């Protein structure tokens, strides 16, 4: 089915208690230079990952809607990935499978949609303008196309500022999972005006 011009998917409302669990700590440590060899090495180690997956909590907050879901993100190859959103009851709300030139999405009614742009599809079906193309890099702790960013005292990404399609996205990282090598983001928050997207990763599996 081709993509409609109206919203179809409605996830469960966001409980107020969930917001406090995703609150990011304020970092006061001095940052490191983006030109440092340690940062270049960390970027290269992350880019060398062929496959990875993570799961955790997702929150979207705007003036129009508040949404909470569990998410599962799996990358199986270059530009091949799967995104699954489930509600607090464990039911699937959205499943997206993407590969070069072909994106398929199944909603909570089992209806299947196809398109060639995952970011546009998510926005039209859910009403949430998630910068999915950039988020694929940001969730790994990489700046993507952004040139305005800061590092923490461990030479890892701590903040990104990026203008895209008239939106000014700010990404703040609240910590990293040092149990994985290389260390991967543990939680992060994206904001543009009154819109906020929060991700809290429970664990990572990297290869």
From Swiss-Prot:
Gene3D superfamilies: Lipoprotein localisation LolA/LolB/LppX. Residues 1-21 form the signal peptide. InterPro entries: LolA/LolB/LppX (IPR029046), OM_lipoprot_LolB (IPR004565). Keywords: Cell outer membrane, Chaperone, Lipoprotein, Membrane, Palmitate, Protein transport, Signal, Transport. A lipid is attached at residue 22 (N-palmitoyl cysteine). The keyword Ligase does not apply. It is a lipid-anchor. It comes from the Bacteria. It is found in: Cell outer membrane. It holds the Pfam family LolB. A lipid is attached at residue 22 (S-diacylglycerol cysteine). GO terms for cellular component: cell outer membrane. GO terms for biological process: lipoprotein localization to outer membrane; protein transport. HAMAP family: LolB. Belongs to the LolB family. Monomer. Plays a critical role in the incorporation of lipoproteins in the outer membrane after they are released by the LolA protein. This is Outer-membrane lipoprotein LolB. It comes from Salmonella arizonae (strain ATCC BAA-731 / CDC346-86 / RSK2980). The lineage of its organism: Bacteria, Pseudomonadati, Pseudomonadota, Gammaproteobacteria, Enterobacterales.
């Amino acid at each position: 089915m081709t993509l409609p011009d109206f919203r179809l998917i409605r996830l469960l409302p966001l409980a107020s208690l969930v917001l406090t669990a995703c609150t990011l700590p304020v970092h006061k440590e001095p940052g490191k230079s983006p030109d440092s060899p340690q940062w270049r090495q960390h970027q290269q180690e992350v880019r060398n990952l062929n496959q990875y997956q993570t799961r955790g909590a997702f929150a979207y907050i705007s003036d129009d809607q508040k949404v909470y879901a569990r998410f599962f993100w799996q990358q199986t190859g270059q530009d091949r990935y799967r995104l699954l959103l489930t509600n607090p009851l464990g039911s699937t709300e959205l499943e997206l499978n993407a590969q070069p030139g072909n994106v398929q999405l199944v909603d909570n009614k089992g209806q299947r949609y196809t398109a060639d742009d995952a970011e546009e599809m998510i926005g039209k079906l859910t009403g949430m303008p998630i910068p999915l193309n950039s988020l694929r890099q940001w969730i790994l702790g990489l700046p993507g196309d952004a040139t305005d960013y800061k590092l923490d005292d461990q030479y890892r990404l701590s903040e990104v500022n990026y203008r895209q399609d008239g939106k000014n996205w700010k990404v703040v990282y609240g910590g990293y999972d040092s149990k994985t090598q290389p260390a991967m983001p543990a939680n992060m928050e994206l904001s543009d005006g009154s819109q906020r997207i929060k991700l809290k990763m429970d664990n990572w599996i990297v290869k």
